[in-house]
Regions:
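Extended, low-complexity, charged alpha-helical tracts
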Residues: 4-205
Length: 206
């Protein structure tokens, strides 16, 4: 499968080893993996785990370089997950706008799930850090600590969404319905395509 764990991990390794525009490359790797999976928390965690494992495996030997590269790679993942939240927001707005057959709990569960993406992101990176090699472990832990203390762009996007949708019952399971997942996956694929075309156009400019 094109989106298998091994292929995602290898793509992340290649992005790190390229040493160029690591944040953009990692964002593209993460987005490509996300768009090829069902839009749900389990799929997102699987992608984050595989990408982070690739980051750790490819960590260069130099301490200073490790910090810089890992920071860029983490930022790329964060940017991709921010797009996931944005895709979820658009899917939610589409569902609310149509309203036909729309159950209140479907909206609440989708919101609860989107709210937890940052938590899943940080916890997954932290879990990978625990078993990472000696070069990558301290840098991953530092990234987790910083993200926990100051937050991520993914979390900021989620918070913005929560402020706009004032529903109660946010402590639901946070599982995405099939209908929501299908719409969000389509939106995310469109975002990924647009970003890819924009990046390709910029690379052509002398």
């Amino acid at each position: 499968m094109a989106d298998s764990t091994d292929s995602i991990r290898k793509a992340a390794v290649d992005a790190i080893k390229s040493g160029e525009d690591v944040a953009r490359r990692m964002r593209e790797v993460t987005l490509e993996a996300l768009r090829n999976r069902r839009f749900d928390r389990e799929g997102i965690r699987d992608v984050v785990r595989a990408v982070t494992e690739g980051m750790a495996a490819a960590a260069p030997a130099s301490g200073g370089t490790v910090r810089q590269v890992m920071g860029q790679a983490f930022r790329g993942m964060d940017e991709a997950l921010t797009k996931s939240v944005e895709a979820g927001e658009q899917a939610l707005r589409q569902l609310v706008a149509t309203g036909r057959g729309m159950a209140d709990h479907e909206v609440k569960d989708a919101l609860a799930g989107l709210k937890k993406i940052e938590q899943d992101f940080i916890e997954t990176v932290s879990a990978v850090a625990s078993s990472a090699n000696e070069r990558a472990r301290p840098e991953l832990r530092a990234l987790v600590e910083r993200a926990t203390q100051f937050g991520t762009e993914t979390g900021k996007q989620s918070a913005k969404l929560m402020a706009e949708f004032t529903f109660t019952g946010m402590e639901l399971a946070g599982q995405f319905s099939a209908r929501f997942a299908q719409i969000a996956s389509g939106v995310l694929a469109g975002m990924a395509d647009a970003l890819e075309k924009s990046a390709a156009a910029k690379r052509k400019i002398p």
